[in-house]
Amino acid sequence: MGRPLPEKGLRLFCLPPAGSGAGIFYPLMELECPELSICPLSLPGREGRAHEKIPHSIPELAELLARDLLPHIRPPYAILGYSMGSLLGYEMIHRWLEWGLAPPELFITLAARPPHRSFGERLSDLDQQAFRQALSQLGGLPKEILADEETMSLFEPLLRQDFQNCENYRVQNLKALPNPISAIVSDEDSLLEIKDVTAWKDCTSGSFQLTTLRGEPHILPPKILKDVIQFQIENTRA
């Protein structure tokens, strides 16, 4: 996180999607929620943790992150998982519960399949041309970056490893979380179907809410991300 955490207010710990890092959540710093602290998390292999080896499974990465955050997990807090980040969040919350910590007030899953549903097409196995075409459809990456061979030679291995971790992850014995879950998905998401996202309701013994966005890609534009998360937080704290 790179900075001291505030003592009061709701902490929203933000877990990024495949290939991304804490920076994708920086637009949330502009949210007009005075009692909310945005806590973007950086993962191994990127940003300030670029020197760290990327774990080769979702559970292994979740274990590492859960232990990193252990000193900071106390009420009130919430988790925002963006795509891959939602799988990490599910695993991390279970670990904190096993270690005797309180659950979050809310678990927000954004553009994410639930842990007991298969990933679908294996993007990590695609050849270079097909893989980059798939990335273009997901949104979030400018065409200039996709066409820059030097940049992609560094970025593509990270993305493929993240996708492979997601593709290989599937929970067989689903354990419901006690906290509410709010799932957000776009009807134009190239990776997901709404019926799959609805299955997040199986992951909680608490309340479940589904929000469907219209016409947005898998990686949301910053303004849409800000608006949808502000709405979720205001609903939770009302």
List where the protein language model places each region.
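Non-catalytic, mobile gating and regulatory segments of ester bond hydrolases
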Residues: 1-238
